[in-house]
């Protein structure tokens, strides 16, 4: 009886850990933003940002090139951190799209209210 219970408990634990692996593939449209600066000030959606010590020109590009997390900001205000192959090599595939509207296709996950998209494909919508 104990072995059966232990087996069921282990199986349930493994299923709980692998649940994010079953994320739904979606295409999400939004603006590519510097996640850290956007969280600090919701007006920081372009390339230049307002910072406590003054405006910072090309702030989002500098942060993206340094490998800081980028996010997709949708028209309804949802923020999806971009990960996966699009964010690899210090955002190499995303840098040219910072502040532009794009469509990203990939697995979407929600963990404790934090949205993430494992971006595999990107399509430019507008600059």
Residue ranges and their predicted role:
Residues 1-9:
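Bacterial N-terminal signal peptides that target proteins for export
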Residues 13-23:
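Sec/Tat signal peptide C-region and signal peptidase I cleavage site
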Residues 23-127:
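Mature soluble domains of exported/periplasmic/lumenal proteins and thiol-rich metal-chelating peptides
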């Amino acid at each position: 009886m104990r072995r059966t219970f232990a087996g069921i408990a282990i199986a349930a634990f493994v299923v709980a850990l692998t649940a994010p692996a079953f994320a739904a593939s979606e295409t999400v449209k939004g603006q590519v933003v510097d996640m850290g600066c956007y969280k600090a000030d919701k007006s920081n959606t372009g390339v230049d940002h307002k910072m406590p010590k003054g405006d910072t020109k090309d702030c989002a590009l500098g942060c993206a090139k340094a490998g800081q997390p980028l996010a997709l900001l949708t028209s309804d205000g949802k923020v999806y951190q971009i990960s996966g192959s699009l964010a690899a090599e210090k955002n190499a595939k995303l840098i040219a799209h910072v502040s532009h509207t794009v469509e990203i296709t990939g697995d979407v996950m929600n963990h404790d209210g934090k949205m993430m998209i494992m971006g595999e494909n990107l399509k430019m919508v507008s600059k």
